[in-house]
Amino acid sequence: MANHKSAEKRIRQTIKRTERNRFYKTKIKNIIKAVREAVAVNDVAKAQERLKIANKELHKFVSKGILKKNTASRKVSRLNASVKKIALA
């Protein structure tokens, strides 16, 4: 284990950050999964509703500094393309 106070503090900080990161990563995955599930069953209305939520949440994470702007835009763009594809079909 740690022999210095600063090392003990770093361990505490790492644990706290790891928990926070895991929470956000899981939330992001669940948001994306919800849209993809609606697309998989060709439910256009539900997919569009969930896409709207995903767009809002992902850009909220950008403002909090959890995701980079381009990453969120890429994810939203890909989700939007998949929803648009089933909407036109």
UniProtKB/Swiss-Prot annotation:
GO molecular function list: small ribosomal subunit rRNA binding; structural constituent of ribosome
Keyword Cytoplasm set for record: no
Coiled-coil spans in chain: none
CC terms in the record's Gene Ontology section: cytosol; small ribosomal subunit
Record has GTP-binding as a keyword: no
Gene3D superfamilies in UniProt: Ribosomal protein S20
Keyword list, A-Z: Ribonucleoprotein, Ribosomal protein, RNA-binding, rRNA-binding
InterPro entries: Ribosomal_bS20, Ribosomal_bS20_sf
Pfam (any one): Ribosomal_S20p
Superkingdom: Bacteria
Any single GO BP term: translation
Family the UniProt entry places it in: Belongs to the bacterial ribosomal protein bS20 family.
Function: Binds directly to 16S ribosomal RNA.
Cross-referenced HAMAP family: Ribosomal_bS20
Name this protein carries in UniProt: Small ribosomal subunit protein bS20
